[in-house]
């Protein structure tokens, strides 16, 4: 719609919400994202990896921050399902049991998306899931520029017993085109508390 294109509405599953933030519909490539806020992402990733116990069945979303988790849990006896080709390759080389979902490969984020991926994910029941996001606000929730990727995230989240969204401080206040989860739908692991979010009970800040 005209309002959506103008950045006045944010698309969510089941409706739309008014936006007082600038919508950023562009999807940065993996090469662009991997050089930004590296130390923050590594600290977040190390903490998140520490939440994984032996014998767990986890979902690992595509993304640079989730990618940094790999070096911190490859010594654990776990099974990982992922829609990220790069994650799957690294896990397999490290000897971790890994399952890569099938579907359409999205070139910019190197993530597998589409109905085939969603159909596969509905068969699984994960103990924990770790997800990336392009933006987060209380009103719009967790957002991403691509509707297909949002649907895969949403499907995987529904199959997780515990859900964690990994995002550095720069993602707060940002809104991308499509909401895949309400703000209160997961625990957030970040490196710095943002003004206006100090009283949120679902945020873990890594010093």
Where are these regions (language model features)?
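A glycine- and small-aliphatic-rich helix-loop capping segment at beta-alpha/alpha-beta transitions
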Residues: 74-79, 148
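Short, contiguous clusters of charged residues that form electrostatic/catalytic patches at enzyme active sites
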Residues: 39-46, 50, 67, 115, ...
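Alpha-helix C-terminal capping segments
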Residues: 52, 69, 73-74, 91, ...
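Conserved phosphate- and dinucleotide-binding cores of soluble alpha/beta proteins
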Residues: 11, 86-207
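HTH-adjacent hinge/linker in prokaryotic transcriptional regulators
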Residues: 1-59, 70, 79, 92-96
């Amino acid at each position: 719609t005209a309002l959506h294109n103008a950045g006045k509405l944010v698309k969510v599953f089941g409706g739309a919400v008014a936006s007082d933030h600038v919508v950023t519909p562009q999807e940065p490539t993996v090469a662009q994202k991997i050089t930004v806020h590296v130390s923050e992402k590594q600290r977040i990733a190390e903490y998140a990896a520490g939440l994984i116990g032996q014998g767990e069945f986890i979902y690992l979303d595509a993304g640079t921050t989730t990618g940094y988790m790999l070096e911190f849990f490859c010594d654990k006896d776990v099974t990982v399902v992922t829609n990220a080709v790069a994650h799957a390759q690294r896990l397999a080389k490290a000897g971790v049991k890994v399952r890569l979902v099938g579907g359409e490969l999205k070139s910019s984020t190197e993530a597998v998306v589409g109905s085939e991926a969603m159909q596969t994910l509905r068969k699984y029941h994960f103990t924990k899931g770790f997800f990336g996001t392009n933006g987060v606000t209380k009103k719009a929730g967790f957002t991403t520029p691509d509707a297909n990727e949002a649907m895969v995230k949403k499907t995987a989240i529904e199959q997780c017993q515990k859900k964690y969204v990994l995002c550095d401080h720069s993602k707060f206040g940002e809104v991308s085109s499509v909401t895949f989860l309400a703000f209160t739908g997961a625990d957030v692991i970040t490196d710095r508390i943002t003004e206006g979010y100090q009283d949120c009970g679902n945020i873990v800040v890594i010093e």
